[in-house]
C-alpha cells in the first residue's frame, strides 16, 4: 500500500482500485527493446533491475532509454542501466516512448504494472498470462 500511495501522489493518479500485473523477466531476445509505448491498459510501470554491473551495460546494450519520440533510439532524455537494484517508475501515456539497444542474454527484471480497471486491462492480463505460460515451454 505504501508504494502504491507514493506513486499515486508522485504522478497525481488515483491508483487505489487499480489491479496489478507482475512480470518476471530473465532474458531478452533480439527483438526485445524495440521503441514502443506501453499498452493503454497499463497506467504505471515499475521496473526493478537485478543485474550485476557488466561490460554490456557500460556499452549501453540493454540499458532502457526514455525517448523523446518514436523515431530514434539515440534521441533519449534518460538512460537507465539495468543494474544493482535500480528502480524506475513512470506513468504510461501516448508519448512515453522507451526502448533499448539490442541485447540478447540474461537481463533480470521485476516489472509491476498498475492497470486500468476495465475490459482492456482484463484482456491485457489474459494475454500476459498466456504469454507467460507459453514462454515456460519455448524459453
Please give the residue ranges for each predicted region.
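A short, highly charged nucleic-acid-interacting micro-segment common to nuclease
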Residues: 1
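Low-complexity, Gly/Ser/Thr/Pro-rich intrinsically disordered linker/tail segments
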Residues: 128-139
Amino acid at each position: 500500500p505504501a508504494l502504491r500511495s507514493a506513486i499515486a501522489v508522485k504522478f497525481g493518479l488515483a491508483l487505489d482500485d487499480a489491479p496489478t500485473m507482475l512480470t518476471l523477466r530473465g532474458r531478452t531476445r533480439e527483438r526485445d527493446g524495440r521503441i514502443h509505448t506501453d499498452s493503454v491498459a497499463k497506467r504505471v510501470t515499475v521496473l526493478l533491475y537485478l543485474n550485476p554491473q557488466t561490460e554490456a551495460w557500460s556499452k549501453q546494450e540493454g540499458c532502457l532509454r526514455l525517448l523523446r519520440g518514436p523515431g530514434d533510439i539515440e534521441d533519449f532524455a534518460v538512460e537507465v542501466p539495468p543494474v544493482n537494484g535500480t528502480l524506475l517508475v513512470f506513468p504510461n501515456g501516448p508519448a512515453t516512448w522507451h526502448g533499448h539497444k539490442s541485447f540478447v542474454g540474461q537481463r533480470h527484471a521485476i516489472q509491476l504494472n498498475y492497470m486500468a480497471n476495465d475490459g482492456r486491462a482484463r484482456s491485457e492480463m489474459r494475454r500476459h498470462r498466456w504469454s507467460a505460460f507459453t514462454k515456460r515451454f519455448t524459453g
